[in-house]
């Protein structure tokens, strides 16, 4: 199985199912960041828009409302699990100018010159061949079409992810991803993203560095948040099941010690650092 197929399997099965289960939590965490990226996304009523790696559809719906019924938005994701949830979400809201499909943005054919603009909230970091993927997006954009996306900066600058993981890695073998390999932090390096976009044909590339405190595990006690993290994080969930009770308790106590300063009024409040990138065809 190649790395792109592995990502599809991961996001359709283990990670996708957990994401759908925790959809409210994930959207609460990511929506403020997505909203900032959308504020940089120059779309107007009547445009046709592509939402890349749309997940469970929250940004797709936001875009659909902004372009009104004159335009439409296509939400594409290679996770069937998440697309099914996105369809339910949009139908519940009665959104008409929207369509969802299971598509591999890297490898599946997209309609040529179909879209005025493309957007992604943390959905473009998982390609095994990013230049191939971004060229495919490029082909789907009309002349002077715009692409805007948000992605994480370095793992070390995002303690919401890194702080607990560093503790877990002391007790469980969590494979370290190779530099720039598919994953949440694939585009931490600004020059790497710039080279991908340039080699894919884009112009007028702009970067915005965005720092924002984000909420995790809203409504939970600190202890419940740690338990949820330990039991539900896809990259080590299976290995955690076979870990001894003593080691699990050590992990719990060490994470509690590190996370306590971030706990504020029934949620964890962590700093985050992202890139928002804008460019044109």
Model-derived regions, located:
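A short SAM/SAH-binding and catalytic strip from SAM-dependent methyltransferases
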Residues: 116-131, 153
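C-terminal helical/coil "lid" or tail adjacent to the Rossmann-like core of SAM-dependent
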Residues: 4-8, 15-22, 206-266
């Amino acid at each position: 199985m190649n790395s792109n197929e592995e990502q599809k399997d991961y996001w359709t099965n283990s990670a996708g199912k957990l994401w759908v289960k925790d959809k409210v939590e994930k959207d609460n965490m990511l929506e403020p960041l997505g909203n900032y990226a959308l504020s940089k996304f120059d779309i107007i009523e009547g445009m046709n828009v592509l939402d890349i790696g749309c997940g469970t559809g929250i940004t797709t719906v936001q875009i659909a409302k902004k372009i009104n019924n004159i335009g439409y938005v296509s939400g594409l994701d290679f996770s069937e699990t998440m697309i099914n949830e996105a369809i339910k979400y949009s139908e519940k809201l009665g959104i008409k100018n929207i369509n969802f499909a299971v598509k591999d943005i890297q490898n599946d054919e997209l309609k040529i010159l179909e879209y005025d603009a493309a957007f992604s909230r943390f959905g473009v970091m998982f390609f095994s061949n990013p230049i191939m993927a971004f060229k495919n997006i490029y082909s789907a954009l009309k002349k002077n079409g715009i692409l805007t996306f948000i992605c994480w900066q370095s793992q070390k600058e995002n303690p919401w992810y890194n702080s607990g993981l560093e503790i877990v890695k002391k007790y469980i073998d969590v494979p370290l991803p190779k530099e720039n390999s598919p994953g949440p932090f694939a585009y931490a390096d600004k020059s790497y993203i710039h080279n991908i976009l340039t080699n894919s044909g884009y112009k007028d590339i702009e970067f915005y560095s965005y720092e924002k405190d984000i909420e995790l595990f809203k409504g939970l006690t600190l202890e419940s948040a740690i338990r949820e993290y330990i039991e539900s994080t896809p990259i080590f969930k299976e290995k955690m099941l076979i870990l001894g009770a003593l080691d699990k308790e050590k992990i719990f106590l060490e994470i509690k010690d590190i996370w306590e300063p971030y706990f504020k009024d029934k949620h964890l409040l962590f700093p985050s650092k992202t890139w928002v990138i804008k460019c044109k065809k």
